[in-house]
Amino acid sequence: MSFRKVHIAIILLAAVVFLLILHHNILGLTDILTRQSSDSAPLVFQRLEALRDAHESPPEERQGEEIAVVIPGVEERLGGLVAAINSISSNTKSNVVFYIITTNDTKGHIRSWLDGTGLKRVTYKLLAFDTRVLDGKVRVDAGAEPVKPMTFARFYLPNLLPETKKAIYLDDDVIVQDDIRDLYNTPLRPGHAAAFSDDCDSVTSKFPVRGAANQYNYIGFLDYKKERIRSLGMRANTCSFNPGVFVANLTEWRRQNVTRQLEKWMELDVAEELYSKTLSASITAPPLLIVFYQRHSNLDPLWHVRHLGSSSGKRYSPQFVKAAKLLHWNGHFKPWGRTSSYPEVWEKWFIPDPMGQFAPIRRHGEADGTK
């Protein structure tokens, strides 16, 4: 009888131990499931975002503050984008992240070019620009060149980079010959959302653009015969600036709602034709000139040596071009075109397209695919 009691007690004890272990495991599993259910959504979202938009960091990952460099990626000009990125990344050891604004049908070409060449070392993110935001905001004159929507992407930097506080914007027809960190560190005065290089600076004003009157003043971009322009009280002889290179304080940009201010003047131009037709066909500079009138800081002139694309001749001396920190081929004569100024400087940084869709055009019609 006593033996049966002992046997029953042992069985009951074993059952209790089993139930305790089972209870513990169930609690642990419940905790794991609870944590997974609360964390899985953002983790999946972040992973998809990384795969969709970001190139993985290179093995020799660069440390320090992120320097955001924004460049448009237009299909027919991708050679310019690649050369610009190569020149920047080769001249700095800083943690540069390239934000390439493009369209969905160009993303694959960009990835192929950057990931399949020596540029696989760079870190970049592809940002899709929704051109529908421009509906009703861009006037198209009869006989004018087709509007290129990507040129307005610079107006929407805070929307495209919502978490970024400061960024550099560059057109795709530039070459950087110094450490981009120096440009990024350009001091911006309190209340200023951007820094530009004035057209009346000591560098560019010495080399006038042939045949262009009022080439460096507001009157060359805005129609001062219109009452709405005159009522702003802006002096017609105020120095203009080129918006192809600038440093932006995006925190201040958001605070002042600069994007909406720019859109306002775009819409008013559609209704009232406020831009001047005497100098150039620029439709991006006028709203920027209005919004940033006497409210922008200045870049070092050597960080925006421009007008190399205004003619096929050599505007500057070889010594000066070598000393420049950033060269800009704004104008019709691009460095990848048939004729241009100092194409050899640009070609130094060009990397041939692995897909064979882009090649510089040179004299006699041959394509030059050399680096």
Swiss-Prot record:
Chief site of localization: membrane
Topology versus the membrane: Single-pass type II membrane protein
Cytoplasm in keyword set: no
Recorded GO CC terms: membrane
Residues carrying sugar: 104, 249, 257
Compartment list: Membrane
Stretches of the chain found on the membrane's Lumenal side: 29-371
Keyword Isomerase: no
CDD domains the record matches: GT8_like_1
Enzyme nomenclature, EC number: 2.4.1.-
Taxonomy, superkingdom: Eukaryota
Segments crossing the lipid bilayer: 8-28
GO MF term list: UDP-glycosyltransferase activity
InterPro entries assigned to the protein according to its UniProt record, in alphabetical order: Glyco_trans_8, Glycosyltrans_8_dom-fam, Nucleotide-diphossugar_trans
Cytoplasmic compartment residues: 1-7
Entry keyword set: Glycoprotein, Glycosyltransferase, Membrane, Signal-anchor, Transferase, Transmembrane, Transmembrane helix
Family according to the record: Belongs to the glycosyltransferase 8 family.
Protein name: Glycosyltransferase 8 domain-containing protein 1
Species whose genome carries this gene: Xenopus tropicalis (Western clawed frog)
Gene assigned in the entry: glt8d1
